[in-house]
Amino acid sequence: MRDVHVHFLHGYCGGYTQEFFEGFITAAQRVGLDEIYLLEHTHHFREFESIYAPIIAYNDYQHDWIKRNMDGSIEDYLTFIDTVKENTYPIKVKFGLEVCYIPETADKLADILAEYDFDFLTGSVHWIDGWGFDHPKQKEIWRSMDVNKVYRRYYDIMCDLCESGLFTGLAHPDSIKCFGCTPAYDLTDSYHKLALLLCKYGMYAENSGGLRLNYDPKLELGMNRQLLDVFRQNGVTIYTASDAHKQIDTGANIRELERMLNEVTG
């Protein structure tokens, strides 16, 4: 089993240490994982500040949130990776980034990413035309939005993400359901278009437990069944992902997420 989305969070702001890293190995072995993908989010690194210009400008909350979280340098992360890779471990470990895809700054993003060589790059959509739709403190903004338009824009951005050719994988492909808002139209065409692009660009998609783990334990686990079925019909590679933001959550829900995939193919 593998967990392809485990946040390192630079030692929970305590710095990059071998001891803290090995805690992830222990946590992964405890739940029977064979492989983990450790990553950092681009909003933690000052080198990526320019891609967040539309986010920072959207409102005061997002300005303050980005400025507060962008507290590190990617160079420290790269040095840490080089050090850790000098040793061997009982499970496979890959290192990468979760990268916010923001269409308005996609060219800048491509230039920045070209400077680095990671094992993987996971693309994610957390912002729709500047708005952080999945931030709990901005949940009320949904009330003023046309849900159908938001969903269409979300999947348009996700398709652009794939067509950028920058990414190895796609994070939580239906995280837009985080607050229970659903569109009035059939998403089948959007799902098929996304599936075809994932295959065309050789990307995997996550079957993610992140919403249940990080938002509400009552939320649906993993992709909705319709999306999962469409991905399977089109031959999309799907990997299980916890979206753990705490070391102890490494591998959370992975067995159940894996069973979902087996049920679809069985």
Q: Where are each of the predicted segments found?
A:
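An N-terminally biased module of ancient metal coordination in phosphate/nucleic-acid-related enzymes
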Residues: 1-103, 179, 185-189, 193-194, ...
